[in-house]
Amino acid sequence: MQDSREKKQCLIFVRNNANDRADRIEAYAKKSGMKVVETIFNTDKKAVERLRYYIERDVIICVLVRDVVDISMELNEIKAVMTLAAEHGISINAESRGYEPALISYE
């Protein structure tokens, strides 16, 4: 049986109720052969917690965002999420970077 990571599953994470942005990113995911597990709108305090849930369970290969600041306005929280994702081999790919993996500076 094929494990879930081999199915190219991704998660979409967008700020607020940006339905048009979410639709655009979802279209990119489908065009790239990825299955969208969930689209999370960062409208409440549990949004980042749900993002961490998916990362920790290794059920996705990447998180698609417009920009990493959609995850949080707090730099420490962004770094924590990106570090967790890296530890699990999951990339956070930003539309603003042409869907290339976002990089984190440890300065």
Question: What is the predicted role of each segment?
Answer:
Residues 1-107:
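Short, structured surface patches at the beginning of a domain
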